[in-house]
């Protein structure tokens, strides 16, 4: 198995912790991303359903597409009213022109846009919304970016390197002549309050650490814990600056006749 594929499929090993400590999106980001008239939504690479459940509070019908059966099992158990199905963004098990919105939360970098974008266009109704969101630590803050250096010193050389990696990950690249218009971006800052123990558990749910050798993983998490404790309160609580980066576009209307393009 290639290294990229091993990392992409590693999250099921920590599915319960992933669901417990990974952040969900802030309401302001959802207000911006999800159109008010969205009645049927597809969540690609839905994981354990953190974004799925936020969608379900706004949308009548949500189809969660997730390839990892371990992640999907947690999603199904925690997400009443959601249809959870096996599948990938490059081959969606969803009928043509059946969704008002297709969303990808913190997973666009795992997709092949050349194959996924035509699939998304296929399942969207005319005028339907493609929304992409990443909710993560705000690496614009120096000490937050430095956490990446501490937990993975071989992969990240500086705080600016951590920020550059994140910018590349947040780049939504569409194939030539995609059937989308009204492209827009926005970001939303907020603060997440949690214990240091939970923050360390959160860092441990990232693929680079899941797939790292045990000794390297333990050392990286120990360094991160030490840095977090320096900023925590006496009872071990820390406020972590967060950012939701959002991207959206609307599907152009299909020609009056002929197959969807």
Feature annotation, model-predicted:
Residues 48-91:
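Class I SAM-dependent methyltransferase SAM/SAH-binding core
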Residues 90-101:
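A short acidic, Gly/Pro-enriched loop at the edge of an enzyme's catalytic core
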Residues 100-114:
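A short SAM/SAH-binding and catalytic strip from SAM-dependent methyltransferases
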Residues 1-45:
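Conserved class I S-adenosyl-L-methionine
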Residues 169-261:
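Conserved Class I S-adenosyl-L-methionine
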Residues 40, 61, 129:
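Residues at the starts of beta-strands that form the adenosine-phosphate
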Residues 115, 121, 125-192:
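Conserved catalytic/acceptor-binding region of the Class I
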